[in-house]
Amino acid sequence: MRKTHTEIHLRNEPEHGHKEYKYLYQQMLKDDVIRKAYKKLRKGKTKRKEIQYIDAHLDNEVQKMYDMILNTKPEGVDVPHPELAYKPKKRTPKIIFEHGKRRKIYMPEIHEQWLHHIIVLVLEPIITATAYLYSCGSFPKRGAHYGKRQIERWLLHDPKGTRCFAKMDIRHFYDSIRLKILMKELAIRIKDDWFLYIIGLCLQGFNKGIPLGFYISQWLANYLLEPLDRLITEVLGLPKLQRYMDDIVIFASSKKVLQRAIVEIRKMLGQRFRLKLKHNYQVCKFYYEKGKRKIGRALDFMGFIFYRTKTLIRKNIMLSATRLAKKMERSKEANRGYFRRHIEAMLSYMGWFTCTDTYDCYQSRIKPYIHVGRLKKIISKIKRRQNHEGMDQGKMLRGAAGAAACG
């Protein structure tokens, strides 16, 4: 009997037209892939001792990574040097508190991070080829500002189609992902047992939940939710979907449509992924004014507060920015220099102010205390100095890669 489109989404079965991928393990062994992965890994970490050591012995370290991957294969497969195979180390989590939430962060060893970057280099074109266009959060050039621009377009150009919105997120998303289910989903399109074995090995010890802090985790999490994006946009016919990792916003013309969609979303998450929506999901009319009455509510999403004709910054971000500005002003009055992390944080906050309708707030709460132009000059000077210091090292890395290519 032929299965319906909805049944295919509820069960982990391949959909028509989806490409299958083989020989990914062989790609991991390519010299240029290993070197490119290391180049990405070392960004922003050049002062770490492990990175400096690898820089000084790059060719040897590349060969070690090659040997490690070559000898990491499933049980029963002959390898030349089994003692060189990748063996996951015991990980001790670091507890952090972020936005009022307690999170466990796992910090892998440097060679393990390198392996993760190699895996992502191979996986990235596979995942991005079929990823939903407005899925944000971990894809390059698809951050909060990318998502914000699209929401503003929808609100401005389609008032009828954005009368109502549903906002929801998945309960304990990272901690609730089951490794067996994740590996089954990967196996739908990836027909390379050796490649899948290495991914499974990286996540060994996490039968339920994938670790925050692993570079591969965010990519695998996005891959897992691709079928959910297709269910909402294609099967349920709701194209105005914005997903920021596990935070989901859907616009529609009526609440009934959104309520029915939530039923299907919960069904799919439960049956296919063994995941649950949080119970505090919202289905609301979008904010509008009728005479002197204010009806509905604004959308609070990705750090922004969206109205029909304006976008503001979330209150806690604005308060953090103003407190930092005053703190830097006190340092200046005491004839103390600025910390680099404070300068970079302040310039980062300026990104929120420049892309939202908060100029009055900037004028009254930020501008009297700091000079943004001077901060930019300080950071520019620091980066120029770092570039000069790292120029010889960069030549060495490029030269080593070129020599390997010639060989």
Residue spans for each PLM region:
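Short beta-strand
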Residues: 86, 239-244, 277-279
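Right-hand nucleic-acid polymerase module
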Residues: 1-9, 108, 113, 117, ...
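Non-catalytic, polymerase-adjacent accessory regions of viral genome-replication enzymes
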Residues: 1-67, 386-407
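Active-site-proximal segment of RNA-dependent polymerases
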Residues: 8-14, 22-24, 116, 120-178
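Conserved polymerase palm-domain catalytic core
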Residues: 149-245, 249-270, 284, 298
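Reverse-transcriptase-like RNA-dependent polymerase core
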Residues: 33, 67-101, 114, 191-205
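Conserved pre-motif C helix in the palm subdomain of viral-like polymerases
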Residues: 101-131, 207-234
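Residues immediately flanking
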Residues: 121, 168-170, 253, 304, ...
